[in-house]
Design a protein with these regions (language model features):
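Short N-terminal helix-initiation segments at or just after the protein's N-terminus
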Residues: 60-72, 123, 142-150, 205-208
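A short coil-to-beta-strand element that immediately follows conserved catalytic motifs
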Residues: 85-94
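Broad gene-expression machinery/nucleic-acid interaction feature
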Residues: 92, 121-125, 197-199
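Short, solvent-exposed loop/turn segments at secondary-structure junctions
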Residues: 95-102, 113-114, 130-131, 144-145, ...
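Catalytic core of non-heme Fe(II) oxygenases with the double-stranded beta-helix
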Residues: 105-172, 213
Length: 247
């Protein structure tokens, strides 16, 4: 049975600081009084403006930062251990901001497979602030998740959602990151702490994992995924196929 999740220390904290600095600069550009503490964003930005600043920071991260190169320095070694050396990555780096008492940022319990994602992928979740208690996310263990999926498959109806326990919430401080299979049931609740949680997340899967079916054709290589790390042998094989000798 797979581990529910694993937490790792970032290989180089200065790399994480580059992601953090990018977000801070985006906020500071629009909100001059912002003091740089991402966990206190809610004291400087109104709730109605949070999503727009998230989108601005998202665009800045994806367009102006060599994030793939940076991620390789942070977590490639652990991804290779889990997926092998030939890896694809989601085309965009995702950014989440969950301020205290904001119900609009609640993401109910779900499996990413329900929105047609691959069950073979892994999610790397990188908090830009300390993530704890209700400002973090919960992950339901693999045994309970699979039991729920089997019951759902048999009945064909929505099952009663599993209520997360306190122990289901992950505690990950800045400087560390978490790897989990997002097919597991997971989500978040209203942030009842006094701290905002800011986090990055992105999906990875093996280059040799099954390609999407018609059900999830938009999750295929070239649209949803791109190459992240390939061995020389795999690169040669790809180039051989491109010659047209293999149909």
């Amino acid at each position: 049975m797979i581990k529910n999740y694993e937490i790792f220390k970032a290989n180089d904290l200065s790399i994480l600081d580059l992601f953090k600095l990018s977000i801070q600069k985006t906020i500071k550009k629009k909100y001059k009084k912002f003091n740089g503490d991402l966990s206190q964003i809610h004291k400087f930005i109104k709730k109605k403006n949070i999503n727009q600043i998230r989108l601005d920071a998202f665009n800045n991260l994806n367009n102006n930062l060599d994030w793939m190169k940076l991620l390789k320095k942070i977590c490639l070694d652990n991804l290779v251990k889990k997926l092998g050396p030939d890896i694809m990555v989601q085309t965009k780096l995702n950014l989440s901001i969950q301020i205290p008492n904001d119900e609009t940022s609640v993401l109910d319990m779900h499996s990413d497979c329900w929105s047609a994602d691959s069950p073979f992928q892994l999610n790397v979740w990188i908090p830009m602030t300390n993530a704890f208690s209700s400002n973090s996310m919960f992950i339901i263990d693999s045994n309970k998740s699979l039991k729920y999926f089997k019951e759902l498959s048999k009945s064909g109806k929505n099952q009663k959602l599993i209520k997360p326990k306190v122990t289901d919430f992950v505690n990950v401080n800045y400087g560390k990151y978490l790897i989990f299979n997002p097919s597991l049931l997971h989500g978040n609740i209203k942030n009842k702490t006094s701290h905002t949680r800011v986090s990055l997340n992105i999906r990875f899967k093996s280059y040799f994992s099954p390609e999407p079916s018609l059900r999830n054709s938009d999750r295929k290589f070239g649209t949803y995924y791109k190459n992240f790390n390939l061995t020389d042998n795999t690169k040669f094989g790809i180039n051989y196929i491109k010659t047209g000798l293999i149909t």
